[in-house]
C-alpha cells in the first residue's frame, strides 16, 4: 500500500521530534546569549544605551523579518540540510561576537546569529509538522518546549561561563552549535528521505500546494 504523501507520516516520529526540540533548545539558547552580554559590551566597548538599542534592532531585523522570506523560499525549494546551514551562521556569528572590538563588528556578528535563527525556524517548524503523524498540537508543543527552555538557560550560562572570565568565553558557545549540528544530522536524513519519496511519488499523489488568493479576495479577507 502506497503511503499518501499528502499526510505528514503514518505515525508520530518521536525521535525526530525530540531531536528537533533539542535543536530548538540549543538555537534559542544561543540567541538569548546576545541580550545577556549587553552589560559586558556596554562596559568593554563603552557603548551607549542607543547603541545597545541598535544592536537589538539589527538582531531582531535579521532574526524576525527575514524568517518569512526564507520560509517562502524553502516552500518552493525545500533543502534537506537547511537546519545545519542555519546553525553554521549562528556559530560563525557567535565566534565573531566573542572577539568583536567595535560596534560595527558586533552588529555584523548579531546579524549572522539572527540569520541563523531565520533559516532554522521555518524549516524546523515544517519538519515538526511532517513528523507529527497528524498530532500537530503535541508535536508543536514539544518543539516549543525546547525553545522556551533554551531561552531561559542562555543567560544562566552567560553568568557562569562568560561574566567571570570575559567576553572571549562567548566562543565556548560554539561548542553548543556543533552539538546542535550533530543532533540535526538524523533529522536531515529523515527529511531527505521524505523529500525523495515526494519526488518519486505519482503526480496525482503529491501534496497540493496552497495557491495565494487573488488580490481582491485578499484585501476583502483582511478588511
Spans of model-derived segments:
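Flexible cytoplasmic inter-helical loops of multi-pass small-molecule transporters
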Residues: 186-212
Amino acid at each position: 500500500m502506497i503511503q499518501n504523501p499528502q499526510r505528514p507520516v503514518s505515525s508520530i516520529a518521536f525521535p525526530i521530534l525530540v531531536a528537533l526540540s533539542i535543536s530548538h533548545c540549543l538555537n534559542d539558547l544561543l540567541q538569548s546569549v546576545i541580550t545577556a552580554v549587553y552589560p559586558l559590551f556596554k562596559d568593554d566597548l563603552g557603548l551607549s544605551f542607543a547603541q545597545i538599542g541598535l544592536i537589538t534592532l539589527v538582531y531582531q531585523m535579521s532574526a524576525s523579518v527575514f524568517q518569512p522570506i526564507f520560509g517562502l523560499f524553502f516552500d518552493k525549494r525545500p533543502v534537506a540540510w537547511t537546519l545545519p546551514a542555519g546553525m553554521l551562521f549562528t556559530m560563525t556569528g557567535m565566534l565573531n561576537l566573542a572577539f568583536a572590538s567595535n560596534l560595527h563588528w558586533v552588529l555584523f556578528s548579531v546579524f549572522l546569529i539572527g540569520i541563523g535563527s531565520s533559516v532554522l525556524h521555518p524549516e524546523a517548524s515544517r519538519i515538526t509538522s511532517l513528523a507529527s503523524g497528524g498530532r500537530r498540537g503535541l508535536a508543536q508543543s514539544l518543539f516549543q518546549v525546547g525553545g522556551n527552555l533554551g531561552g531561559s538557560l542562555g543567560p544562566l550560562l552567560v553568568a557562569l561561563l562568560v561574566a567571570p572570565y570575559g567576553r572571549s568565553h562567548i566562543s565556548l558557545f560554539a561548542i553548543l552549535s556543533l552539538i546542535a549540528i550533530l543532533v540535526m544530522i538524523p533529522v536531515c536524513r529523515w527529511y531527505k528521505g521524505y523529500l525523495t519519496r515526494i519526488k518519486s511519488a505519482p503526480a496525482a499523489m503529491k501534496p497540493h500546494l496552497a495557491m495565494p488568493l487573488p488580490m481582491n479576495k485578499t484585501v476583502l479577507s483582511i478588511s
